[in-house]
C-alpha cells in the first residue's frame, strides 16, 4: 500500500465548529480533540498535502431547521435533533474549524444532510474519481462512527486508505485506540502526520 502523492487525496471528517470547535455540544468529543491537539495535527497534515499538490476534501454535515433530508433513524441523530440549533445550515456551527487552516480557495467541500459517513448518497466518489484519486488519507472525527464509516465505505468503493493515528479521535480515548487496533488496522495503513509529511516531501 502506498501513500505517495500521485492519485492521493486527503479527506477530513466533520472538523466543523459545531462538532469539534467552540460551538460543539458534544463535550466529550470536543475535549478529546483538544486533549490530543488534533486540530493542530490536521493543520500540519493539510499544509503538507497542499505543498505537493495533494487535493484536500472536507466532508461536512449540516441540517435544515425543519430536518428535511435528515432522517432521524439513529439514537444519536434523535438525541442531537433535540437541540433546535444543531448544525443548522447557514450558521457558524457548520463552518470548518479555523484551527485546521482550511484554504477555501483551494480545498474542496463534500457536504451532506444525512447519515453518518461521507460517501452514501453524495457526490464524493464521483468528485474523487474525476481527479483520478485511488488512495485516501482519512482524518478527523470520530473513530466511533464517522471515520470508521468513511474507511469502510472507501474500501468498499475500491480506494486504498491510510489513517494518521495522531489526526483522528474517538471517545473514550481507550476505545478510539481499540478501534484503530482492531477495526481499522485490517482495512487501512495506520501511519502518522510526520510519516506522511516526510514521504510526500521525499517524493518532490
Regions found by a protein language model. Give the residues of each.
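A short, N-terminal amphipathic alpha-helix
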Residues: 37-55
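Short acidic, Gly/Ser-rich segments with clustered Asp/Glu that frequently serve as metal-coordination loops
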Residues: 16-21
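Residue-level preference for long, well-ordered alpha-helices that form the structural scaffold
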Residues: 31-38, 172
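Short glycine-enriched, charge-decorated loop/helix-capping segments at active-site entrances
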Residues: 25-34, 85
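Short beta-strand segments at enzyme active-site cores
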Residues: 54-61, 164
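N-terminal nucleotide-binding beta1-loop-alpha1 segment
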Residues: 11-15
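N-terminal, charged amphipathic alpha-helical interaction modules
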Residues: 49, 59-64
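Active-site-adjacent betaalpha module
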Residues: 1-9, 47-52, 69-70, 76-204
Amino acid at each position: 500500500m502506498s501513500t505517495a502523492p500521485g492519485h492521493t487525496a486527503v479527506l477530513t471528517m466533520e472538523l466543523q465548529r459545531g462538532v469539534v470547535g467552540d460551538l460543539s455540544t458534544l463535550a466529550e468529543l470536543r475535549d478529546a480533540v483538544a486533549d490530543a491537539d488534533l486540530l493542530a495535527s490536521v493543520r500540519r497534515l493539510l499544509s503538507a498535502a497542499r505543498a505537493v499538490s495533494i487535493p484536500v476534501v472536507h466532508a461536512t454535515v449540516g441540517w435544515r431547521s425543519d430536518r428535511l433530508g435528515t432522517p432521524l433513524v439513529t439514537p444519536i441523530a434523535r438525541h442531537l435533533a433535540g437541540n433546535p440549533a444543531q448544525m443548522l445550515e447557514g450558521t457558524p456551527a457548520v463552518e470548518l474549524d479555523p484551527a485546521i487552516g482550511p484554504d477555501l480557495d483551494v480545498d474542496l467541500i463534500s457536504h451532506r444532510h444525512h447519515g453518518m459517513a461521507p460517501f452514501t448518497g453524495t457526490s464524493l466518489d464521483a468528485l474523487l474519481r474525476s481527479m483520478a484519486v485511488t488512495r485516501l488519507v482519512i482524518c478527523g472525527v470520530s473513530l466511533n462512527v464517522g471515520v470508521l464509516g468513511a474507511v469502510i465505505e472507501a474500501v468498499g468503493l475500491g480506494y486504498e486508505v491510510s489513517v494518521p493515528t495522531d489526526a483522528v479521535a474517538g471517545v473514550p480515548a481507550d476505545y478510539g485506540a481499540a478501534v484503530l487496533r482492531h477495526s481499522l488496522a485490517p482495512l487501512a495503513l495506520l501511519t502518522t502526520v510526520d510519516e506522511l509529511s516526510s514521504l510526500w516531501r521525499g517524493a518532490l
